[in-house]
């Protein structure tokens, strides 16, 4: 039966008239569908004419619902004549809660359609979010009315019980529907006021439940089933993080990690001045990435330190790693425990508190018997006990725990074949490390007071640490305890005091002051050699030594012009020095007779040595006279010998090979022992042997640095014993050097010390792009997942040599090349693609943390700026091999810049509480250049591959990358996700709509606090919903 549309009334009126006629004539659903289409033009939704509103209004006019109208409503939904959003919105407006039969009918209707709710147009998306929130609010209102009725009558009518049952079923369906939960999450951000009203309604229900004691169960009503209040709580307190998202690796935590030991080796050896709070932030970040508990993190840190100590025996870094493992690590654990509010308990025996996580960490460490057995045997002591005693000092554990844990270890250690405790180098080093804390405290206390009052005691303490490797030990302990800056400041102050003569000095005071000047100068020079001059210049002062080290000291990676040093000399001082040299009794006596200031002599020595060298070249001075002059310099002050050697080494770097022999002979003479009457007079000085020994070490280091340069005369090699050439740059091709380094790592499964320095040299010589390409090549050689994960961990740690530049090289050069170029790079296929995606994400997150901290992670002096300039200028990664360390780099696309934004603080790096995540993390995290530009380029490359409808391994790599980025970074990574091109996720969704693509993942990819983020998220989850429903309909 076709209806005549001759009347020119509005279509809304026509639809209402048609409803009345359909009811009178009892049309079937099909008849209704045929006739209604005569009014609705093709492609026009009934929502435009409020069709759903008209049908529901007629359906609930009486005391009971009209099922015929509800059948028309369902048919209109199935025929897509009206939207689910319009239906839910109209049902939520029904407020006649006393009509129980109508409520039951509407709830039954909802039960039948709720699982199929979706959107089929852009206009519906915005309506559905508010409609869903309104529907939940409506369900809560119904339940609240029933509770109020129960509070008044202490019982429920049968119809009210049916209403409660229907509400429970609908709520359960919503809770179990990921799409509706996603829509609710968007609606919560879209209309906060409505969601606040929802929360208030729930609070009222909770209070009524407590008052009345009425609890309605969902489902069968057994003891384990959910209650209606539980379902409401899940909806009202809904968070995006609660939505289901399939874990990247199945949520498993790796049983063994290979990243911490290389990371410790790199940071301790190449960045010894790193503060404790930087280690804390770095370790918490690693914990998040790996999913470790704090107990596991603490255990892996201690285990990594013990493995790193395995091959330090006899090396220059032995004291540094020992001090880090047994002094620094306890302080790191203490700060980690304090900053993260670690769990604490009271010891029953003593009443003292202790850290539960630290105790669990030691219990885990005791399970790693091979490492402990080997270190106990090598150290001839119980290394666990040494660590435990330090933990007790910091109140992380109690003496009771020490006894218990040592007792567990004792049966194993008793049967070990230990080295002789008096001859084991590591044993002696451990004893010295623990003993040096007290002398260091005494030195710092003396340096902080007036030097004129304690100069005798201060000189004795400083000279005491010059014997053997005591100075290295003191410096190592000072660096790991965070006292290095105080130590340097005190030495600078002491040196400035000692260089100034006072008229009131009598007796031995002038001699002590001169020795104090000499010792403090050389200790500072030794520090500048070992840790870089930047640690001295960081004080920002204008003292004598700071000026000397900045303008006169020869340094690795900081070339200084020898002729500029010569020109800065004062001619009057130079003239007087020449007169002292020509003194008939020798240079030593001449210097004693002069009234020159010591600092002026240091500034003028380069000019004096230059004139002497030129005279020797022209044969106008005999070698014997030169020997007497040099002996006089070093006999008077070892400082003068260091100044002379510094200029000579700088000079040798600038001249031809045939002009290097005479300057090197002069340097050798400075290192040689004194003889004759001059030696007897020299021995009368205070602590002359200790001062001379330190001077020899400093000068020999200068020689070794000169030998690293490619322009060294081959004849000079014969002047040095073989042990002095251990740091000479290898002449093997770079490929072979890298293969040797990787072989050493692969054989052990950890990073040896010498390999750490070799990889750092390769990074500086070849650039990050070359090194990262070689490392990734080793990753793709692996066949098994276990080997892949192990290799990825080691590569991730090695990239911390310079994490920012290596990350930029990986993301801007290597990954795009692998996506775009099929011939020259390995194919991105699973499982390699999965591990590569994990490496990329780890590097992005760590680089964000590193680049936004206030303090630089690595101190490389002016070499850093030189590297950045080269990176910006070069156009090819294939640069000529340059032997000067730090001057040959590969090209990256990164342009350095300082984007403004809030910087990461230590607190932002700590594990936040659940409430802190949503409010603080997103506002703190910002991206800076060059990482931001690099990611934008990478995402554009991703978009090129997802433009087609073909699911390829490379497209799946993009999905793995985004999935792990969301899982590992959470809200902190939102600034990265904002760079995703519009439509990228939707294009990926159309190709890869598998079970791995969930509503939870999609919502985490967008910032729901912005209108555009909510719009794109809603569009994507609706698309996913429709794809899933189409698949289900095909199965049917």
Curated annotation (Swiss-Prot):
Belongs to the Mediator complex subunit 24 family. The keyword NAD does not apply. This is Mediator of RNA polymerase II transcription subunit 24. The gene is MED24. The lineage of its organism: Eukaryota, Metazoa, Ecdysozoa, Arthropoda, Hexapoda. Its main location: nucleus. It is found in: Nucleus. GO terms for molecular function: nucleotide binding; transcription coregulator activity. It comes from the Eukaryota. The keyword Nucleotide-binding applies. GO terms for biological process: positive regulation of transcription initiation by RNA polymerase II. Keywords: Activator, Nucleotide-binding, Nucleus, Repeat, Transcription, Transcription regulation. Component of the Mediator complex. GO terms for cellular component: mediator complex. Component of the Mediator complex, a coactivator involved in the regulated transcription of nearly all RNA polymerase II-dependent genes. Mediator functions as a bridge to convey information from gene-specific regulatory proteins to the basal RNA polymerase II transcription machinery. Mediator is recruited to promoters by direct interactions with regulatory proteins and serves as a scaffold for the assembly of a functional preinitiation complex with RNA polymerase II and the general transcription factors.
């Amino acid at each position: 039966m076709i209806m005549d549309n001759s009347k020119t009334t509005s279509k809304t009126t026509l639809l209402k008239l048609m409803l009345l006629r359909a009811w009178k004539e009892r049309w079937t659903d099909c008849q209704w569908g045929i006739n209604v289409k005569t009014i609705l033009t093709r492609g026009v939704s009934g929502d435009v004419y409020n069709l759903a509103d008209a049908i529901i209004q007629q359906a609930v006019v009486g005391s009971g619902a009209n099922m015929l109208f509800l059948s028309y409503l369902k048919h209109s939904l199935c025929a897509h004549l009206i939207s689910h959003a319009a239906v839910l919105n109209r049902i939520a407006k029904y407020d006649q809660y006393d009509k129980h039969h109508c409520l039951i009918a509407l709830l039954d209707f909802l039960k039948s359609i709720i699982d199929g709710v979706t959107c089929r147009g852009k206009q519906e998306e915005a309506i559905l979010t508010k409609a869903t929130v309104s529907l939940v609010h409506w369900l809560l209102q119904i339940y609240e009315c029933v509770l109020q009725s129960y509070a008044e009558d202490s019982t429920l009518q049968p119809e009210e019980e049916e209403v409660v049952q229907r509400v429970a079923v609908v709520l359960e369906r919503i809770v179990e529907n990921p799409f509706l939960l996603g829509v609710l999450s968007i609606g919560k951000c879209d209309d906060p006021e409505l969601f606040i009203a929802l929360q208030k309604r729930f609070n009222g229900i909770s209070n009524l439940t407590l008052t009345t004691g009425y609890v309605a169960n969902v489902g069968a009503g057994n003891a384990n089933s959910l209650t209606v209040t539980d379902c409401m709580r899940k909806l009202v307190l809904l968070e995006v993080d609660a939505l289901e998202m399939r874990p990247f690796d199945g949520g498993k935590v790796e049983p063994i990690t290979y990243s911490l030991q290389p990371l410790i080796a790199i940071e301790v050896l190449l960045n010894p001045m790193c503060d404790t709070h930087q280690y804390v932030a770095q370790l918490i970040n690693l914990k998040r990435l790996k999913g470790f508990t704090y107990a596991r993190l603490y255990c892996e840190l201690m285990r990594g330190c013990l493995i790193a100590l395995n091959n330090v025996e006899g090396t220059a870094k032995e004291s540094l790693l020992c001090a880090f493992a047994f002094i620094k690590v306890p302080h790191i654990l203490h700060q980690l425990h304090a900053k993260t509010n670690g769990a604490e308990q009271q010891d029953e025996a003593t009443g003292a508190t202790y850290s539960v996580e630290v105790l669990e960490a030691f219990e885990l460490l005791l399970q790693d018997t091979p490492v402990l057995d080997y270190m106990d045997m090598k150290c001839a002591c119980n290394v666990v006990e040494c660590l435990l005693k330090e933990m007790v000092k910091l109140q992380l554990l109690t003496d009771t725990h020490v006894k218990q844990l040592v007792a567990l270890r004792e049966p194993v250690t008793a049967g070990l074949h230990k080295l002789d405790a008096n001859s084991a180098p590591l044993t002696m080093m451990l004893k010295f490390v623990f003993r040096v804390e007290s002398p260091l405290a005494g030195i710092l206390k003396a340096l902080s007071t007036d030097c004129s009052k304690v100069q005798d005691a201060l000189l004795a303490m400083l000279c005491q640490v010059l014997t053997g490797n005591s100075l290295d030990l003191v410096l190592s302990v000072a660096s790991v305890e965070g006292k290095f800056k105080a130590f340097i400041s005190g030495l600078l102050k002491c040196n400035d005091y000692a260089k100034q003569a006072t008229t009131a000095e009598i007796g031995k005071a002038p001699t002590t002051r001169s020795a104090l000047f000499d010792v403090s100068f050389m200790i500072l020079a030794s520090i500048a050699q070992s840790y870089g001059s930047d640690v001295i210049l960081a004080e920002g002062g204008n003292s004598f030594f700071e000026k000397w080290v900045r303008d006169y000291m020869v340094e690795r990676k900081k070339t200084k012009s020898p002729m500029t040093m010569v020109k800065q000399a004062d001619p009057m001082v130079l003239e007087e020095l020449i007169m002292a040299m020509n003194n008939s009794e020798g240079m030593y006596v001449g210097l004693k007779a002069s009234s020159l200031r010591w600092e002026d002599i240091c500034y003028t020595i380069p000019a004096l040595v230059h004139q002497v060298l030129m005279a020797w070249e022209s044969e106008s001075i005999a070698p014997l006279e030169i020997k007497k002059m040099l002996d006089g310099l070093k006999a008077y002050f070892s400082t003068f010998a260091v100044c002379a050697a510094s200029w000579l080494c700088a000079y040798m770097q600038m001249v031809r090979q045939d002009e290097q022999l005479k300057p090197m002979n002069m340097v050798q003479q400075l290192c040689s022992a004194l003889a004759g009457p001059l030696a007897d007079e020299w021995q009368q000085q205070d602590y002359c042997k200790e001062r001379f020994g330190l001077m020899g070490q400093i000068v020999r280091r200068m020689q070794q640095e000169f030998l690293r340069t490619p322009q060294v005369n081959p004849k000079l090699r014969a002047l040095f014993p073989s042990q002095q050439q251990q740091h000479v740059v290898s002449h093997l091709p770079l490929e072979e050097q890298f293969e040797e380094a990787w072989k050493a790592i692969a054989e052990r499964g950890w990073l040896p010390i010498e390999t750490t320095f070799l990889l750092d040299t390769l990074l500086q010589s070849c650039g990050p792009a070359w090194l990262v390409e070689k490392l990734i090549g080793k990753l793709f050689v692996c066949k098994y997942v276990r080997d892949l994960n192990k290799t990825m961990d080691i590569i991730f740690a090695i990239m911390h040599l310079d994490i920012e530049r290596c990350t930029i090289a990986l993301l801007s050069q290597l990954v795009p090349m692998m996506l775009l170029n099929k011939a020259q790079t390995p194919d991105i296929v699973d499982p390699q693609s999965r591990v590569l995606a994990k490496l990329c994400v780890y590097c992005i997150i760590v680089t964000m943390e590193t680049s936004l901290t206030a303090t630089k992670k690595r101190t490389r002096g002016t070499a850093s700026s030189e590297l950045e300039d080269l990176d910006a200028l070069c156009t090819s990664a294939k640069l000529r091999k340059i032997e000067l360390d730090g001057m040959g780099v590969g090209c990256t696309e990164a342009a350095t810049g300082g984007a403004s934004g809030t910087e990461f603080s230590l607190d932002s790096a700590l594990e936040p509480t659940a409430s802190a995540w949503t409010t603080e993390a997103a506002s703190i995290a910002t991206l800076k250049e060059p990482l931001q530009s690099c990611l934008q380029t990478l995402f554009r490359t991703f978009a090129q591959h997802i433009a087609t409808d073909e699911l390829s391994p490379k497209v799946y790599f993009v999905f793995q990358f985004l999935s792990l980025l969301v899982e590992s970074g959470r809200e902190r990574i939102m600034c990265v996700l904002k760079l995703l091109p519009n439509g990228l996720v939707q294009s990926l969704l159309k190709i890869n709509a598998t079970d791995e693509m969930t509503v939870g993942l999609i919502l985490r990819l967008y910032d729901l606090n912005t209108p555009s983020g909510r719009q794109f998220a809603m569009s994507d989850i609706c698309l996913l919903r429709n794809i899933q429903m189409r698949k289900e309909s095909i199965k049917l």
